[in-house]
Structure formats: C-alpha cells, structure tokens
Amino acid sequence: MTLEEQQAKEALDGIIKKSRVHLYKPIQIAEILYHDRCIKQLDFLNLDTYRNQSKRWRDEICRRFLGRISTSSAKFQDNLFEKNAIPPEKLAVLGTLNRQSDGGVESYIYKQFFNRFSQMSERLAYVGNTDRYSFQLSEFLNLFWLEPGLKRSIDKIYEIVVYALFDALVSELGITVSIDFPKENLFLWEEYQDFAEKIITMPKNEHLKLPAKIHRVGVTNAADRGLDMWSNFGLAIQVKHLSLDEELAEDIVSSISADRIVIVCKKAEQSVIVSLLTQIGWKSRIQNIVTEDDLISWYEKALRGQYPIAEALLENIKTEIMREFPAVNEANEFLDFAQNRGYDITVTHF
C-alpha cells in the first residue's frame, strides 16, 4: 500500500473502532463504495452528489439487518465526511482500492459488522445458558469490557442491567398507581367526558388503579441526548456510564438532558467523577451515583438472596438485549446477502 492508501485505511479503521455495534457510519461508507463499483461511478470529490443519497442506501441495509435506522442528528451523521473522519479525498482512495479488489473494502467493512454481531450472540448465549445459581453480573459485564468491538456499547449494557433489576422489582412488589380527581371537578369531567374517556378509561367512581410500569426507551445512538427510562408514575431517568479513560467532561455536557440522571461508574473512579461533576456545575442534576460494585451486590441479592426475583430479572436482560441488538438472532439473512454480493467475510484486509 502507498502512504495515501494506508492513511485512508487507518481512517476507515478509526471509524469502525469508534462505532457502536450497529456500525451505521461504516455501513454508509460500504454502500457508497458498492454503488460506485456496481451501479454508477461516483465523483467522490463532489460530496453533495452522494451525501444525502448515501444515507438512504445505508438505511436500506440497516432496516434489513438491524430493524432500525440511525436517529442521530443530521450534523452528527454528516461529520462522517469531516477531515478527522473520512473526507472525500480519502473516500476517493478507498473507492479506487475497492474497485481494484472487486469489492474488497466493502467485504472488509461487512466482515467487521458480522464480527460485532457474532460477538453479541455469544454474550447473549451467556444469559441463555446460565440460571439464578450460575449467572454472575461481573462475568457478564466483563464480556463487554474485555472485547474492544463491544466496549463502545457498554453504556447500553449498564442501562439494560439497571432497567432489568428496576422493572423486575416493581413487578414483584405489585406496585400500583392510582388516578383520580376531586369530586368538585365532576362537572368539568362531564363536560369533556366524550373526549376524555377516549384517552383515559375512567370508571364511574372517578378512580382508576393501574399496575406500575417501567419502560425503557432503548435503541439510542451515540449522539442522542434523550431519556433512557420512564414510568407511569412520574419517574424519568437517564442512565449514564462514565469512565475516566474518556473525555469525561465533554461526555457529560453532550449527553445529559434528563432531570434525573443516574451515573454508573467503577468504584475506584467514583470520587474523581463526583469532584469533576461538582467543578463543572452538574452535581445538582445527578440523582445518584451507582458503582459497579453496587450493581453486583444487588444482583447477588436478586438472584440468590432470601427473596430472589431471578426469573423476571434474567428474562428482562435477554429481552432487552434482543431489542437493543435485533440482529442477534438465528434467522437473519446476512450470510445470503454477503454471498449474493460476492463478499468474502473471512477477509481480514484489503
């Protein structure tokens, strides 16, 4: 490889490494290269001729294999083509390499996609192959911490772990939520009853009791700043994993938006994170800080304690992983797709 080609490959590898398991941006690059090679040769240096089209090409693949598309802001999606990512000049070099290798760069990208979801399938198998006696939260978390391809998604795993325990506990406790209104406002209800009853099915005694529910929004992207969990009893929480090996302050400012934020971190980093949160003025927005040790202790109680809630807990984890990473299933058509395009997904270079 020439120096120019090596730099283009390093830029692509950087995008792949930074991507979460869904690999939206690498898939967009692969589809640009595919359309250039097989459908119509592109003018790579003229970004406006393929910038928006390439999002549609990417979305078509993502809907097929992921069941969703990127919901990140247009600005976040477009920074794929900035100088510190894959600018048109480097994309042109990749395009030449891709044509010369008969789709080798495309194969390389989709190999990474296949690897990520193969790794995720193995992690899901851990949940399926363990029970309340053998499941260890520390082992489960390390399956992601120790795998570079999945480490970028560790915040989603923490979110799932927190939600699974919270939801199982609310369900097992049998918590209910009551809705009513003062009798002196009965005249107002009667005035708008035909409309209101279509929204809230209120019984004649003006009192409604519902089972408490926790809902996880899920399926978020790296640039999303929204809610993680909400309930029908007023609770709205964002779970945010923080680590000192990242650009912590920037990560906090760009990611926190909910009124109640639960920070998840390593025990050894807790005091430093609290200090930094205080310095940048975010301490008041933090409802609590949960350490990994806390979660492990709570899971031990939930799985093997005096009053276990293991069945609901483990089922929640499995369900939410399948929901967050829907390509983790035995029926996906990815291998047929790769074969039809002539990809060699055993390729380790191009």
From Swiss-Prot:
Protein's GO biological process: DNA restriction-modification system
EC main group: hydrolase
Keyword set, alphabetical order: Endonuclease, Hydrolase, Nuclease, Restriction system
Enzymatic reactions: Endonucleolytic cleavage of DNA to give specific double-stranded fragments with terminal 5'-phosphates
Protein EC: 3.1.21.4
InterPro entries, per database record: Restrct_endonuc_II_HaeII
MF terms in GO: type II site-specific deoxyribonuclease activity
Domain of life: Bacteria
One Pfam entry name: RE_HaeII
Record keyword Nuclease present: yes
Purpose: A P subtype restriction enzyme that recognizes the double-stranded sequence 5'-RGCGCY-3'; the cleavage site is unknown.
Name of protein: Type II restriction enzyme NgoBI
Protein source organism: Neisseria gonorrhoeae
